């Protein structure tokens, strides 16, 4: 892999995914992150051809897709497989690659580091493809400076102390997960974890609650559908505790809604009288809900679709505000967001 080469990543989110992309950047290569939802017949084949991909990092679960179309990709020279699975000709195990890299660096470290140091702001970092719902997908080219600038802009709105942890639940192929999921964490010296991959997508989803309790994240990325599922889980758990607890929970929500109002006017005017009741409900109910998220969760960052105001009020009431970001891939992607200091959910 040489500077300027395009290398795809087709894998479920994992630490190895992040390490692979950072390794590509050090080598001066261009990352082409791809969604695991792509089917090989059209969508995947088009992207690999259009981007002129020379190598691909692929998980063992996605490998069959590559095998079925490899004969149609004469430019594809290397297939690096994440996970343990019997390999075919022309495929290299991720573990083998790591050993080869260690051996190479033991003799050529300075020469290799010069490649990364020579990268310029306007050099391409990633090519991210749009969905292509009305025509062929478009490759959005983002430079290294696009990413670093958006990281700086994001950190002007939200403080990330070095002790913060996050668990990335969303797919890593989108630049939202890149910037808000791990690049701002790297910039601040904070910690990133990824969900334990299951044999099926459903098994991976089932790992999320346990992984949250293990990691004890300080913030989580979300999309409205995921936030709604979390809320359904919370309300289902409350109902299971009986009518009294359910009634108390709804009274607590109404009180918190009245106290918080639209967020920015929290506790204003006569609402200050509700503060002791909100504190009581927090101690009795809401704190226990937060413990199910690991006990350290400060906020969510939402994106990807319109976030319902009622959903924002709900999470603000239980003590885990959900900040709504807006952006687009071409903007790397964050354009605007509310934040702890500027929170309004009208």
What are these regions (language model features)?
Residues 1-38, 169:
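Conserved AMP-binding/adenylate-forming
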Residues 11-12, 29-46, 60-65, 192-214, ...:
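ATP-dependent adenylate-forming carboxylate-activation enzymes
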Residues 21-27, 50, 186-187, 316:
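Short hydrophobic alpha-helices that are characteristic scaffold elements of the AMP-binding
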Residues 26-100:
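Structural core segment of the AMP-binding/adenylate-forming
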Residues 81, 98-129, 136, 159-165:
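Conserved pre-ATP/AMP-binding loop-to-beta segment of ANL
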Residues 125-151:
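Conserved AMP-binding A3 loop
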Residues 148-165, 172-275, 279-283:
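Conserved AMP-binding/adenylation subdomain of ANL enzymes
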Residues 193-196, 273-276, 295-302, 307-346:
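Conserved ATP-binding loop and adjacent catalytic segment of the adenylate-forming AMP-binding
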């Amino acid at each position: 892999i040489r500077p300027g080469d395009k290398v795809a990543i087709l894998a479920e989110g994992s630490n190895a995914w992040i390490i692979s992309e950072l390794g590509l950047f050090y080598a001066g290569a261009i990352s082409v992150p791809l969604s695991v939802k792509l089917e090989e017949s059209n969508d995947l084949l088009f992207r690999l051809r259009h981007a002129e991909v020379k190598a691909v990092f692929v998980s063992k679960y996605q490998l069959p897709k590559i095998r079925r179309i490899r004969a149609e990709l004469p430019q594809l020279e290397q297939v690096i497989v994440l996970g343990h699975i019997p390999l075919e000709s022309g495929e290299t195990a991720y573990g083998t690659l790591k050993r080869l890299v260690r051996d190479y660096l033991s003799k050529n470290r300075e020469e290799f580091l010069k490649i990364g140091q020579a990268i310029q702001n306007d050099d391409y970092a990633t090519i991210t493809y749009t969905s292509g719902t009305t025509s062929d997908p478009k490759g959005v080219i983002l430079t290294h400076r696009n990413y670093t600038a958006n990281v700086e802009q994001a950190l002007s709105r939200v403080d990330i102390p070095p002790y913060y942890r996050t668990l990335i639940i969303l797919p890593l192929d989108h630049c939202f997960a890149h910037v808000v999921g791990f690049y701002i964490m790297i910039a601040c010296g904070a910690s990133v974890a990824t969900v334990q991959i299951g044999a099926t997508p459903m098994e991976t989803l089932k790992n999320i609650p346990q992984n949250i309790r293990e990691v004890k994240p300080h913030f989580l990325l979300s999309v409205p559908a995921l936030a709604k599922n979390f809320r359904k889980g919370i309300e289902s758990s409350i109902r299971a505790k009986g009518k009294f607890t359910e009634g108390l929970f709804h009274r607590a929500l109404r009180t918190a809604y009245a106290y918080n109002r639209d967020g920015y006017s929290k506790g204003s005017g006569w609402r200050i009288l509700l503060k002791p009741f909100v504190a009581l409900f927090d101690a009795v109910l809401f704190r226990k809900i937060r413990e199910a998220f690991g006990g350290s969760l400060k906020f969510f960052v939402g994106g990807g679709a319109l976030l319902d105001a009622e959903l924002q009020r709900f999470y603000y009431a239980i003590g885990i505000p959900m900040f709504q970001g807006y952006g687009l891939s071409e903007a790397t992607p964050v354009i605007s967001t509310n934040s702890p200091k500027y929170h309004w959910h009208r």
